From Swiss-Prot:
Organism: Buchnera aphidicola subsp. Baizongia pistaciae (strain Bp)
Coiled coil: none
Gene3D superfamilies reported for this sequence: Translation initiation factor 3 (IF-3), C-terminal domain, Translation initiation factor 3 (IF-3), N-terminal domain
Function: IF-3 binds to the 30S ribosomal subunit and shifts the equilibrium between 70S ribosomes and their 50S and 30S subunits in favor of the free subunits, thus enhancing the availability of 30S subunits on which protein synthesis initiation begins.
Major location category of this protein: cytoplasm
One Gene Ontology molecular-function label: ribosome binding
Source superkingdom: Bacteria
Alphabetical keyword list: Cytoplasm, Initiation factor, Protein biosynthesis
Protein name in the entry: Translation initiation factor IF-3
Keyword Oxidoreductase: no
Swiss-Prot/TrEMBL GO biological process terms: ribosome disassembly
Subunit structure: Monomer.
Subcellular location: Cytoplasm
């Protein structure tokens, strides 16, 4: 299936609530976050029912476990809402690739450079691949000149992350990152 929205994983009860709590005594915190102290589980459940809320085990590993009186449904909703907000704020950085040849003509060079600029302005990383074919391997200096030209043309927009020192296989790879954050 293509497209569509990614389903956000629903948080399944990470905390024990009400009668699921197994400890005899708990360290209780009320709705406002005030420490009530160490009380029996029975009295903590009674206080939670009195206010019409749930008793939620916050820290099960401490001795005695820390429990808080709260509306558990609202707590889960707020937690999932904050996770959604964090995902919205994240920018996925893609790596775009543009391929050059040592003898790329001026018109093609300008078109590819324009695409490089567009990718960098969108905040993506760009992988510039310079490919050698046949006897072009003899003229590696031309390839380095092309990469240096790209580097100098994009000096205001991009930072060079990786610059090739030698040919790897039949290609040279340079990786550029956008300067603006």
């Amino acid at each position: 299936m293509k497209g569509g929205k990614k389903k956000i994983q629903i948080i399944t009860k990470p905390n024990k609530i009400n009668h699921e709590i197994g400890a005899e005594k708990v360290r209780l915190t009320d709705v406002n976050g005030r420490q009530i102290g160490i009380v029996t589980l029975k009295s903590a459940l009674y206080k939670a029912e009195e206010v019409g809320m749930d008793l939620v085990e916050i820290s099960p590993n401490s001795e005695p476990p820390v429990c808080r009186i709260m509306n558990y449904g609202k707590f889960l909703y707020e937690k999932s809402k904050s996770i959604k907000e964090q995902r919205k704020k994240q920018k996925v950085r893609n790596i775009k690739e543009i391929k050059f040849r040592p003898n790329t003509d001026e018109g093609d060079y300008k078109v590819k450079l324009r695409n490089l600029v567009r990718f960098l302005e969108e905040g993506d990383k760009v992988k510039v691949t310079l490919r050698f074919r046949g006897r072009e391997m003899v003229h590696q200096k031309l390839g380095i000149d092309v990469l240096n030209r790209i580097k100098s043309d994009l000096i205001e927009l991009a930072v060079v992350e990786v610059f090739p020192s030698r040919v790897e296989g039949r290609q040279m790879i340079m990786i550029l990152t956008s300067k603006k954050k």
